């Protein structure tokens, strides 16, 4: 292989369509646009969602829902995640360092998903009733 012999793979490059250059080209006369109508004219396109003056679908349907402003700042952590951690004390900083929650997270909650087989102390995190029971059953505790 030499630099002067490099060429694109077969079929990776396509020739530009040259329209309106005679009948023999297959794209002459109307140039693939059909006959008459708005879409055959130059500049003859409408914006996305335009329905010819009829009230468009996106305006006929009601607005729904909202974007939560707190979503980026709260997180959930499972018992399964905590089981994988080496730390005996788990707080928000430990979770961030382990990559279990994002850097922007201000508060996290432990939820009961998976099992916990060792003693763990949870500091400064919320916990569901099921998670709290599982942590205490394993000999751990939750500190505010």
Swiss-Prot record:
<comment type="subunit">
    <text>Part of the 50S ribosomal subunit.</text>
</comment>
<dbReference type="InterPro" id="IPR036227">
    <property type="entry name" value="Ribosomal_uL15/eL18_sf"/>
</dbReference>
<dbReference type="GO" id="GO:0006412">
    <property type="term" value="P:translation"/>
</dbReference>
<dbReference type="GO" id="GO:0003735">
    <property type="term" value="F:structural constituent of ribosome"/>
</dbReference>
<comment type="similarity">
    <text>Belongs to the universal ribosomal protein uL15 family.</text>
</comment>
<dbReference type="GO" id="GO:0022625">
    <property type="term" value="C:cytosolic large ribosomal subunit"/>
</dbReference>
<protein>
    <recommendedName>
        <fullName>Large ribosomal subunit protein uL15</fullName>
    </recommendedName>
</protein>
<feature type="region of interest" description="Disordered">
    <location>
        <begin position="1"/>
        <end position="48"/>
    </location>
</feature>
<keyword id="KW-0699">rRNA-binding</keyword>
<feature type="compositionally biased region" description="Gly residues">
    <location>
        <begin position="21"/>
        <end position="31"/>
    </location>
</feature>
<keyword id="KW-0694">RNA-binding</keyword>
<keyword id="KW-0687">Ribonucleoprotein</keyword>
<dbReference type="Pfam" id="PF00828">
    <property type="entry name" value="Ribosomal_L27A"/>
</dbReference>
<dbReference type="InterPro" id="IPR005749">
    <property type="entry name" value="Ribosomal_uL15_bac-type"/>
</dbReference>
<dbReference type="InterPro" id="IPR021131">
    <property type="entry name" value="Ribosomal_uL15/eL18"/>
</dbReference>
<dbReference type="GO" id="GO:0019843">
    <property type="term" value="F:rRNA binding"/>
</dbReference>
<comment type="function">
    <text>Binds to the 23S rRNA.</text>
</comment>
<keyword id="KW-0689">Ribosomal protein</keyword>
<dbReference type="InterPro" id="IPR030878">
    <property type="entry name" value="Ribosomal_uL15"/>
</dbReference>
